[in-house]
């Protein structure tokens, strides 16, 4: 790392324009310093490359979150110039600081919980909605991982047509996008084609990206809503995720209250209980989630606020159910999963480094086929309305068991105390060649007065114990059960990852 240099905001701005243009493969005159960086399609991997180059220029690593809190090159350059002045001349090797001093504003999540007062089922036609036999279902998130399996379950468990919100140029391209997604997970069947209706729009836009006329027509057509769409990112702050995850949820609730009342089945997350207030406690499905203090991950913050909006709508009389999955694993039958999810990136990245962290972490992921089957079944039970469900794995295993399974495949890996593993991460995951590179902000960014990373906070304060007993009771008597996390499941997952080339044989 170089010594800190004195650069003006103009110097930094000129440097950023040049380097962003190089990163994106465009001419420098195509970069406008006053335009939001997101408009250039900057993803988390490219953002980390830019941060690394900034570190070499400035002599300290700026918080990656600054790229979203100061979203234009002009505003970011001004902030970085201020940070240069604020920095002492001594070498700063701990670049990530507490959120009161890392340049990111402190956020009051409770103040974000504001649902448009016009969103109220009282103004819609009260109908005897077909909870157990939906006819026309509207689904968000259908081009995602869980969403693909929800489409399959809705088509298999019901006779309904599924209207899928999709970003695309037109309906034909939208349907092709949905089909390609299902094909990617090997769950597409030709008979699905006639029952999938693409709705071209955008979760992050007002009225879901539809015109007022289109929005009203959709509200009149559908009878049930499954809202699983969300932007999942472990690096982006709340501000970058709010439009899709929070405001998008508000628009879904608006749709549910237009023309006629439609039940909303919302896919939330167990992350709503990340506040240290719940640390070490048993949290049941019916427990309140009023505490937000100490939730630092932007994605988790948006899920907390969004679920609060759903709860407000429920209090206003809208029929809702809430489904809280944990980390979601691949299909327990085929092993097919999302190779970009946290667990797979962690495993591959740790294998490349040759070490795993030696931590007391319980692996509680649930296979996607279990999660999707449970959500669709539970949503069609009248007694489910107004309730929340936990799709947590009922029998989690420790991370050490995963490490033992990895070793059984012949991989030579060691375990290190978490602090030593973090040092290895800093020294070895220095480019996008290692999957952990894009997760560095999540794994290394320091928060709170104690200067702890998010994993540190979990490990020190202990995670809550998410109870799923009420959910298991609701599923009793069905064939829906959560497969055990055992050697068979690990073999199924690993075989798929090796077959696709995501992992290589030891």
Curated annotation (Swiss-Prot):
Its cofactor is pantetheine 4'-phosphate. Residues 10-84 form the Carrier domain. GO terms for molecular function: oxidoreductase activity; phosphopantetheine binding. The gene is hetM. GO terms for biological process: antibiotic biosynthetic process. Binds 1 phosphopantetheine covalently. InterPro entries: ACP-like_sf, Far_NAD-bd, NAD(P)-bd_dom_sf, PKS_PP-bd, PP-bd_ACP, Thioester_reductase-like_dom. Keywords: Antibiotic biosynthesis, Oxidoreductase, Phosphopantetheine, Phosphoprotein. The modification O-(pantetheine 4'-phosphoryl)serine is found at residue 44. It holds the Pfam family PP-binding. It comes from the Bacteria. It comes from Nostoc sp. (strain PCC 7120 / SAG 25.82 / UTEX 2576). This is Polyketide synthase HetM.
